[in-house]
A protein has these predicted regions:
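Conserved phosphate-binding catalytic cores of ATP/NTP-utilizing and phosphoryl-transfer enzymes
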Residues: 1-5, 116-138, 320-321
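Glycine-rich phosphate-binding loop plus the immediately following alpha-helix
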Residues: 143, 154-198, 222-233
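A contiguous, well-structured pocket-lining segment that forms one wall/lid of small-molecule binding clefts
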Residues: 35, 77, 192-275, 282-298, ...
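Glycine-rich beta-strand-to-loop/alpha-helix junction loops that act as flexible
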Residues: 87-89, 106, 143-145, 275-284
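Short beta-strand scaffold segments in enzyme catalytic cores
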Residues: 17-23, 139-141, 147-151
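N-terminal beta-alpha supersecondary unit
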Residues: 5-90, 119, 123
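Short Gly/Thr/Asp-enriched flexible loops that form oxyanion-binding sites at enzyme active sites
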Residues: 86-111, 285-293
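Conserved phosphate-binding/catalytic loops in two-lobed NTP-binding clefts
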Residues: 116-117, 274-275, 292-317, 331, ...
Length: 357
């Protein structure tokens, strides 16, 4: 029996310091041996958002410990690692540089290959960590830095069907939470507040809802929330605004996802249609429920990766590294950090397509 490759993955693109060790089984499917994630919520809470310099400093302080924890939990020794995969972009360059430099140094010290990974590719292929999916499939990536519809055709093969033309959905959730007085990161709390409110209290805008294909826009919605928040006087009104915001997002995603379905089907005449949702916002139960029902209505199989691999994590980075390792797609140690790095290189660059701000 041949030795299965062991890949160390490192992720520091924003405010999570993460490391993971993965291998594969006899069928070639990835197996997560460890997946350690250290969040920086307490570091950034008082500022109401991520401060890049503080995030980078925290990465520097923690990365040695996090990588060691990943190795310890995996039960593997340093010398057993076959390759090191680090996120090279997109993201905050001061944060990317920490994990990228560490990964290069680690790989060099054990004389093993180094692999640079696109953070978005990690999200795009993350379902492969838990499901033996066939290509192609339709992906909705919704996180704090990205909101995109992508046709996933395989490693390195992506076609962007739609993207946000301004702000990411996760950012809209976090900014709305901040305006309502919810502590950072408040996005996940919006759903809880919405349960206490009337979703029909406010008629909020749905930017480009009837144009732009399956492109998305949330800047106008954020502006409307800002104006209304200045008139709010009671806690119940805050709950009502949260509920109206949640409802509006669901309506936008329902309409745009149906358009994405139609576009995907035009390009792919296949029997089994698969729709995957990844990214931190995929944890929102109301959005999940709406999208699951939409899939049933349109004969799509819906797949939501587990919460621990929906957000930023190193298992998805290691998994992409594993696929590249098997194809001997290695990188030189002078590979640069890429704060802007689109998956579909042929697509027009838009603010929300491949950059975290």
């Amino acid at each position: 029996m041949s030795k299965k490759p062991l890949i160390l993955g490192i992720e520091t693109s924003c405010d999570e310091t993460a490391a993971s060790v993965i291998t594969e089984n006899e069928q070639g499917n990835p197996i997560i041996l460890s997946n350690i994630i250290s969040s920086q919520t307490d570091v950034h809470k008082e500022f109401g958002g991520v401060v890049p310099e503080l995030a980078a400093r925290s990465h520097i302080e923690k990365i040695d410990l996090i990588v060691q924890k990943a190795l310890d939990k995996s039960g593997k020794k340093i010398e057993e690692i076959d390759a090191v995969a680090s996120t090279a972009g997109p993201g905050l360059i001061v944060c990317l540089s920490v994990g990228l430099s560490f990964g290069k140094a680690f790989a060099s010290s054990i004389n093993k290959p180094f692999i640079a990974v696109n953070h978005l590719e990690g999200h795009a292929l993350s379902p492969k960590l838990v499901s033996n999916l066939d290509y192609p499939y339709l992906l909705l990536l919704i996180s704090g830095g990205h909101s995109q519809y992508l046709k996933v055709q395989g490693l390195g093969k992506y076609k962007r069907l739609g993207t946000t033309i301004d702000d990411a959905l996760g950012e809209a959730f976090d900014k709305t939470a901040k305006l309502l007085g919810i502590e950072f990161p408040g996005g996940p709390q919006i759903e809880l507040w919405a349960k206490k409110g009337d979703p029909n209290s406010y008629d909020l805008p749905k930017p480009i809802i009837n144009k732009g294909g399956c492109n998305l826009s949330f800047a106008g919605l954020k502006t409307a929330i800002l104006k209304i928040s200045k008139t709010i006087k009671t806690e119940q009104e805050k709950f009502n605004l949260a509920a109206s915001f949640q409802k509006t997002i669901e309506e936008i995603l329902k309409k745009k996802t149906k358009i994405a379905f139609d576009e995907f089907e035009k390009q792919n005449k296949i029997q089994e249609k698969i729709f995957v949702v990844a990214g931190g916002v995929a944890a929102n139960k109301k959005i999940r429920s709406m999208l699951i029902n939409l899939c049933k209505e349109n004969n799509y199989q819906s797949i939501f990766p587990p919460i621990e691999i929906c957000g930023d994590n190193a298992a998805m980075i290691a998994m992409v590294g594993l696929e590249k390792y098997k194809l001997k797609k290695f990188n030189e140690l002078d590979y640069p950090a890429k704060p802007r790095w689109q998956l579909d290189e042929s697509a027009l660059f838009l603010k929300g397509a491949g950059v975290k701000l």
